């Protein structure tokens, strides 16, 4: 295949145009209908049959190859070591900025992978559940940095992923409410030995500081077998964030339980100014300082244009 010359920011990747990538679908069957695709789409994200056929079906086909190869390697390693071990799930990370469409991508992948033969068990979690409760963030003076690396209970998240990777049964993860903008007390989801686990979050590819004494310092991505970064230019992300904020002002913010209920009465001009201020103060800073620098660590990068559709795909060379 004639693949375009790598762009400097994507080295060491093979970069495919949308048309080139779409041809890699080969004979992968379409297993979702229009109604199912609509249900997977997040607010203001664009997802239709064509996007699934041209972008996500080729990715599903690629992942089937990666998963099968990992399973063969796992069996070979067990045979080499002479051990009997628990089944290890394949873990996929999905990263990218606020408002870029991570949740849609993660849900589409979950739906497509779960329809492989012989119907693997595919679970999905977001790292939002591992944010510290608002009371803790307020006490530490970092409420304005919610979503930054320091706002997560990293030891709890690492322990969760370690248990999953070890094949343990009924591993629990905290639940986060986007309505109340906080951890739901005494509420958990249970992940019970999936074949594939998708982990979605803004900072899942974040690295830690290198130790001076040579001791291992684990990071979330140490547990990933494959990772996807959803990319878009900053002005586009800003526009998407503002559009989403305005849409939520007209819907979810009207619920008295909403953390952002105070924004419901705002005019379009006031809501736009508020959204831009939040973007500049929190989301842009997090993007520039923490999220975007992790892009080169991804296995695959999906670059979106202003219309929300993927324009290029960059796949890390083996």
UniProtKB/Swiss-Prot annotation:
Its main location: cytoplasm. Keywords: ATP-binding, Coenzyme A biosynthesis, Cytoplasm, Kinase, Nucleotide-binding, Transferase. Coiled coil: none annotated. The keyword RNA-binding does not apply. GO terms for biological process: coenzyme A biosynthetic process. It is found in: Cytoplasm. It catalyses: (R)-pantothenate + ATP = (R)-4'-phosphopantothenate + ADP + H(+). InterPro entries: P-loop_NTPase, PanK, PRK/URK. ATP binds at residues 96-103. Pathway: Cofactor biosynthesis; coenzyme A biosynthesis; CoA from (R)-pantothenate: step 1/5. Disulfide bonds: none annotated. SUPFAM superfamilies: P-loop containing nucleoside triphosphate hydrolases. One of its GO terms (molecular function) is ATP binding. GO terms for cellular component: cytoplasm. It comes from the Bacteria. The keyword Cytoplasm applies. Belongs to the prokaryotic pantothenate kinase family. This is Pantothenate kinase. It comes from Rhodopseudomonas palustris (strain BisA53).
């Amino acid at each position: 295949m004639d693949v375009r010359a790598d762009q400097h920011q994507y080295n060491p990747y093979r970069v495919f145009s949308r048309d080139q990538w779409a041809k890699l679908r080969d004979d992968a069957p379409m297993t979702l209908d229009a109604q199912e695709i609509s249900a997977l789409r997040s607010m203001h994200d664009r997802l239709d049959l064509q996007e699934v056929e041209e972008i996500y079906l080729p990715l599903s086909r690629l992942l089937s190859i990666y998963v099968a190869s990992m399973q063969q390697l796992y069996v070979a390693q067990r045979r080499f070591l002479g051990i009997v071990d628990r089944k290890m799930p394949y873990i996929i990370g999905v990263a990218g900025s606020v408002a870029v469409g991570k949740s849609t991508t993660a849900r589409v992948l979950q739906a497509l992978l779960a329809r492989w033969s012989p119907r693997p068990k595919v679970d999905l979690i977001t790292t939002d559940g591992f944010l510290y409760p608002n009371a803790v963030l307020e006490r530490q003076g970092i409420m304005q940095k919610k979503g930054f690396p320091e706002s997560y209970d990293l030891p709890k998240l690492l322990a969760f992923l370690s248990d999953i990777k070890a094949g343990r049964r009924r591993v629990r993860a905290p639940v986060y409410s986007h309505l109340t903008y906080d951890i739901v007390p005494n509420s958990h989801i249970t992940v019970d030995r999936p074949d594939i686990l998708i982990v979605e979050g803004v900072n899942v590819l974040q690295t830690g500081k290198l130790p001076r004494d040579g001791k291992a310092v684990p990071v979330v991505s140490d547990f990933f077998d494959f990772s996807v970064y959803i990319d878009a230019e900053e002005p586009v992300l800003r526009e998407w964030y503002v559009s989403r904020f305005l849409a939520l002002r007209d819907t979810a913010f009207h619920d008295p339980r909403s953390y952002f209920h105070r924004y419901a009465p705002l005019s379009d001009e006031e809501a736009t100014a508020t959204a831009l201020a939040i973007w500049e103060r929190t989301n842009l800073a997090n993007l520039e300082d923490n999220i975007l620098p992790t892009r080169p660590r991804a296995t695959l990068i999906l670059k979106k244009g202003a219309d929300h559709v993927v324009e290029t795909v960059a796949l890390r060379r083996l």
